[in-house]
Each structure stands twice: as structure tokens, then as C-alpha cells.
Amino acid sequence: YLHNIAGIPSDKPVLIAANHPTAFVDPIALCIYLDPPIYNMTRGDIFQRPWARKMLEDVNMFPVFRMRDGYTGRERNDGVFEFCQSKLVKKQVVAVYVEGEHHLDKQVKPVQKGLSRIAFGTYQNHAPEDLQIIPVGSNYIYGDRTRDELKLLVGAPIFVKDYWEAYQLNPATAINRLN
């Protein structure tokens, strides 16, 4: 079941804020059902093997490094955030799995702050007035079975410029509001 899948513009910078009920199917589903091409943020440790890195990069996946996986400090992701900004400035689509993990629970886990940091960093460094965040929800009947039914829901855009003034006054509060 697909809802509003035409809601992703191809002529504007878009951050997709997606949930992540399954490990590998979610990014594939987004790439199959949504246009334009999507760059997917992916757990960094799976890029350590050269053959895996090549395969993942060929399908527009790029690494992100989580502290809970043993990576220290946010500076490891500075290059990741710059990569995202470079794609957004070119009016491309970047998908961030905002819960920071996959799970089969039928509820959304707490949203991590990476998406907001990417959005505000892009706006601060490049000021794209049309930068938007589009929520995308994936839900499966079971999630752990092959040939399961997928419901893919594309929500209304959230414009980063609407949060910019709040970010300038208090970045932490604006990040929490945007999340």
C-alpha cells in the first residue's frame, strides 16, 4: 500500500525522515517506490570490508558512525554531514533513518538528532530556502517474513526555514522542536 509517493519533489533539496522497521528492506523500498534517486545513510561498520563498501556506494548508501557502535565523538560524522550538505545543495534527496536503529516494534523509537543537525547545518552554510524534511513511514504486517505487505506513507513537507529563527536563538531547543 502506497500513500502520497509522488510527494517527494525532484527539484528541491529533501531530507527524508524515515523510520526503520527492517534492516535492509527499508532503504530498498524507498529507492524502488520513490523518485528521484535517494542517498541512504547506513550503519558505518558494514563499510569496513572493501567489497561491501563498493557495493553499498554503488547503490547510493553512505556510512554514518554511531557512538553506541564504539565510535567516539561526533567529529567522526563531520564528513558524513558535509556529504549530505553537498547532495542537498545539488537538490538531491538524502534519507536518514531517524531512530538510529531498526526494530519491528509497532511504534516509533526516540528520534536521534542527526537529521536536525544536517538540516540546520545545510541551511546555515548554504541557505537553501526550499530545504525540506519529508517524513516517510514504513510499516509491515509482520516484518520478519518474506513477501510481507508494506505500507509506505509519505507525509507533508516540513520547511527548515520555519525553524531557523528559533535555531539562531537557541540551537538545542530548535533541534528538539524539529525532531
Predicted features and spans:
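Soluble catalytic domains of membrane acyltransferases
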Residues: Y1-T173
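A conserved active-site cap/scaffold subdomain adjacent to cofactor or substrate pockets
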Residues: N176-N179
